[in-house]
Curated annotation (Swiss-Prot):
InterPro entries listed in its UniProt record: Acyl_CoA_acyltransferase (IPR016181), Asp_Glu_LeuTrfase (IPR017138), N-end_Aminoacyl_Trfase (IPR030700), N-end_Aminoacyl_Trfase_C (IPR007472), N-end_Aminoacyl_Trfase_N (IPR007471)
PANTHER family membership: ARGININE-TRNA-PROTEIN TRANSFERASE 1, ARGINYL-TRNA--PROTEIN TRANSFERASE 1
Record localization: Cytoplasm
Protein origin, superkingdom: Bacteria
UniProt name for this protein: Aspartate/glutamate leucyltransferase
Amino acid sequence: MKFSDPHLLPAGLERSLRFYVTNPSPCPYLPDRKERKAFTNLAIPEADALHNVLSQSGFRRSQSIAYRPACTRCNACKSVRVATREYDISRNDRRVIARNAHLVRRPVAAQATREQFRLLKSYVVTRHDNGGMSDMTYRDYVAMVGGSPVQSLIFEYRDGPEPDAPLVAAAITDVLRDGLSMVYTFFDPAKTSQSLGHYLILDHIRHAHDLGLPHLYLGYWVKGSPKMDYKRRYKPLEVLDGDRWRPLRDDE
């Protein structure tokens, strides 16, 4: 396995890593294609160091597993990240931020709550009813949130400063050496006028910048996929090309 910066790995760890590949399954992004993933276990003492290197090399985290696409005849899934220091905020971005100025972001430990789960179920039923999370139970959500062996937080967005103000949105977020990584976000699907999905990304860009972190990792961009193509709006967007990150061109 080739890493973008293997020097960040603890001595000897690269030789002991084991990677596996899943069997082919239907691609969730492009029709008539199959996907495979390479993955490894993050539940080791050096989890944070490994997670940082793997994230820079195009991996994503799901519970205690780090994975990335390993398809044989397709490389449409591109790892992308926003350059937070150079982000070009648009007039529409400012309007979305203004519409959500009343929301209060609060970082909490990566521990599941019933309140979060109710919001998640409402979001999934409305937005992704045919997806793999439609039958998620509270126990599944506990495992999803609490199964992280790396530095993770949940950013809760509440409709006011009171601790018991209504929960409007939440973002499961990993904290990396060079940025924040948005693992999963969900929000009140009834509040369509607030563009909450867009706002959560904008707020993470701003928060990463305030923390002095140069990147916000957004996962995979897939050109032509309605589920993933929206990410190209966040400019400047960097794409992992082989083992190096470069700006995504407007004509791509």
